Amino acid sequence: MYDIVIIGAGPAGSTLARQISKSKKKILIIDAENEKNKKPCGGLLAPDAQKEFAHYDLVLPKDILVSPQIFSVKTMDLVSGKIKYYQRYYLNMDRYKFDKYLVSLIPNNVKKINGRVVSIKKDDNYILEVLDGTKKKLINAKIIVGADGCNSIVRRTFYDNNIMKYMAIQEWYNCVDSSNSFYSCIFDKKTSSSCSWLIHKDEYLIYGGAFDIKNSKDKFLEQRERLSKFLNIDLNNPVKKEACLVYRPKKFNDFVTGKDGAYLVGEAAGFISASSFEGISCAIRSADILSKIINDNVDIKKITKLYRNKTIKLKIKLRLKVIKRWFMYTSIVRNIIMTLGIDSIKINK
């Protein structure tokens, strides 16, 4: 019997495990990610996430960072043809190495297993069925925390999961021409109500985007063709393809923190920016909030109430991102902003 089982060892799960490890509780963290099963991600550490790291006095080993480092984003509208540049302060990194670094910070008194939770039942406690390779095992826990991102099994099992979702698809290419911008944000209302991206990482170029789930593959391929013509580049021979679901919160009810000993952190709780899909800062923030509450309390009802209340500020911040999204993704408004050059920078070539 474990006091706490954390499902998912991304930034949210790793942070939570590290911060509650000082307690006398028996803790287990379960993660299915490995070299062959990586989460598709642009791998950019935004300023908000960097600030969260600063609160822990953490540093990033240089082998996590990749080349080049980024100072601006090239924003393109494939319909209007407009291009503008905006200053940004992202760290370009290897997301898989980043996640594994965070896992390495978890003390040894927290047990770690690699596996996938396939079902959860509630009895007096929680009973988790875990698939470890070809073997299934049952694990009992007093408290479970879903840190397993979009379509979390904890959220699907116990809570409303009707939050809007996109299919994020990205492809990797061998990069032989780095003459184009190192980081680009792409809008194309003909193929997506969301955005796409181009990012250089060492010897690779990544092209990806978020698409409506219905016909997502066809829309991705259509946009890829349109982008290839727009930039005059060849995107027909990827060396790797990735895809996953991603949440797009629209209302306060999309943010679910949990109750009765089954809690959610990070994207599993809906804590992700609707405008940029940045979720690392929210993952760390929500995990930090829950860890402090768990460390100071044993009563389930009190944990539930405190966690719900102490994440209100985060929920408001993310609700404002929904409003920001309207300005970014409404084509007529975006065209006005780009035409006027609001907040853009000039590039000297």
Stretches with model-predicted labels:
Residues 143, 151-218:
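Conserved FAD-binding catalytic core of PHBH/FMO-like flavoproteins
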Residues 51-62, 69-156, 164-166:
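Conserved N-terminal helical subregion
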Residues 13-14:
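N-terminal Rossmann-fold NAD(P) dinucleotide-binding loop
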Residues 33-56:
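Conserved N-terminal glycine-rich FAD pyrophosphate-binding loop of Rossmann-like flavoproteins
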Residues 292-349:
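C-terminal helical "tail/cap" subdomain of flavin- and related membrane-associated enzymes
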Residues 5, 9, 21-41:
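Glycine-rich FAD pyrophosphate-binding loop
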Residues 119, 215-290, 299:
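FAD/FMN-dependent oxidoreductases across multiple families
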